[in-house]
UniProtKB/Swiss-Prot annotation:
Full protein name: Putative hydro-lyase ROP_32680
One term of GO molecular function: lyase activity
DNA repair is among the record's keywords: no
Keywords: Lyase
Length: 262
């Protein structure tokens, strides 16, 4: 498997389908949602009112297949897997949406927590889903996002089990990257988020907790997909959860510098 963003996007364009967690360490990854221009303002307002799960990194012009985050990339072919939505229902899952793209579609690129996984792992915190070769588990919570126009829906979270003695470290590192969801929204008991069973994620794969692990939950960029379903958008194209756009932007660009206290 190649490890540069350009080579990985080329592999996806050629038909390689794999979750992107752990790929291209050091480079940001993004969620994708493309909606008709008639819905774009409502979606933009929804993201602005809910910046924790929906931090916007780029918005394309209507019909554009490009993004400043990955010059030369085609966002209709260069993600490993997409979802196509009609009237809020999942209509298809495919590795290429170029034939479905429309001149009125506006693409939103939303920060992804895979981006902070590299610095978290570099600090010695294990990533269980990467160790186990699986997609990160994601759950629909009972926490409603702030609605915006015709768009509403619940917050989705991703979960990573972290050894108890490293919980504060993982929280501190991710908190310095608010453009990719920042610090966790909850630590510990999943029932406080309305999650009944960690072994049955709504998206992604279940992950085994090791003895001493504590579940940590981060706001997730799949939240707009939950809003698509709840709001019954007539048409939308999104990434498949866990199958992101790998950008050319270093993850270090999204780290907030801590002022010198001296």
């Amino acid at each position: 498997m190649p490890d540069s963003p350009t080579d990985l996007r080329s592999a996806f364009r050629s038909g390689r389908v794999t979750p992107t967690a752990g790929l291209a360490p050091g480079f940001a990854q993004t969620n994708l949602i493309a909606v008709p221009q008639d819905w774009a303002y409502d979606v933009l307002l929804f993201t602005q009112r809910n910046p924790k799960p929906c931090p916007v990194l780029d918005v394309g012009d209507a019909g554009s297949r490009t993004t400043m985050l990955a010059p030369g990339a085609d966002i209709t072919t260069d993600l490993p897997l997409y979802r196509v939505w009609k009237d809020g229902e999942l209509a298809d899952e495919t590795a290429d949406v170029s034939s479905l793209w429309r001149d009125d579609l506006v693409a939103f690129h939303i920060g992804c927590s895979f981006t902070f996984e590299h610095p978290v792992a570099a600090a010695g915190v294990p990533l269980r889903h990467v160790e186990q070769g699986s997609n990160v588990p994601m759950y629909v919570t009972d926490r409603e996002c702030r609605p915006a126009g015709r768009v509403s829906g619940p917050m989705v979270v991703s979960m990573r089990p972290v050894p108890e003695h490293q919980v504060s470290l993982a929280a501190a590192i991710s908190a310095r990257m608010p453009a990719v969801h920042g610090g966790p929204v909850h630590i510990g008991d999943p029932t406080e988020l309305g999650i009944a069973d960690l072994g049955a994620p709504d998206f992604g794969d279940p992950v085994n907790l090791e003895p001493g692990d504590v579940p940590m939950f981060w706001a997730c960029g799949v939240t707009p997909q939950a809003a698509v379903m709840a709001s019954r958008l007539p048409f939308a194209i999104t990434h498949a959860p866990g199958y992101m756009l790998i950008t050319d932007t270093p993850d270090s660009e999204y780290v907030l510098e801590v002022p010198d206290a001296r």
